[in-house]
Design a protein with these regions (language model features):
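C-terminal edge-of-domain segments
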Residues: 155-174
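Short acidic capping loops at alpha-helix termini that bridge into adjacent secondary structure
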Residues: 138-141
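RNase III-family endoribonuclease catalytic core
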Residues: 10-125, 135
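Pyridoxal 5′-phosphate
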Residues: 144-148
């Protein structure tokens, strides 16, 4: 496996960049359900090394990917006990700092959560508020959607949840 040096000071000549993120976690008893930095009432939660906020993890990967800074596992590895049980809002905040330190501004986020239950839509306004505060961008620049998988696959069988996210960033001053 080739080693990729994400510490390069190289700045792309492309003023606008997009990134894509994906994350998945298993639903299990004994965990709280955190999505978009919001605790959602439900009988199960997502299992993971951190608080397993599948949405915020996908957003982190989208932002890091857009800036060519690797992925969430590179910066916050599950092998590091510092991140055991960590609030994913902290990871998102640190990710935004990394992106800004690399010379970029965050434009917008578009993300989708796939879950059979519970209903996610009632919680989206609060998720957008929380993410806006953590990321330092306007709520109107954060689009969140929820869908089911029509009872297909592990998500449809209520075994887990997944999230997809895209991010637009730009070289500072391009917006």
């Amino acid at each position: 496996m080739a080693y990729v040096d994400y510490s390069s000071n190289y700045m792309s000549q492309i003023p606008f960049r997009t990134g894509f993120g994906y994350d998945v976690h298993r639903l299990s008893d004994g965990y709280d359900l955190w999505l978009g930095g919001v605790k959602i009432p439900y009988e199960q939660g997502l299992e993971g090394h951190s608080d397993a906020d599948v949405l915020l993890h996908a957003v982190c990967d989208a932002l890091l990917g857009a800036a060519a800074l690797g992925d969430i596992g590179v910066h916050f590895p599950p092998s590091d006990m510092t991140y055991k049980g960590i609030d994913s809002k902290i990871l998102l905040s640190r990710t935004c700092t990394l992106v800004r330190e690399a010379g970029y501004e965050i434009g917008n986020i578009d993300a989708t959560i796939a879950a059979e239950a519970p209903k996610i839509n009632p919680h989206i306004p609060q998720m957008r508020r929380v993410m806006s505060e953590v990321m330092g961008i306007p709520e109107m620049d954060i689009s969140l959607k929820a869908t089911t998988t029509e009872r297909l696959g592990f998500v449809g069988h209520r075994e887990g949840m997944e999230a997809y996210a895209t991010a637009l960033i730009a070289v500072k001053g391009a917006f």
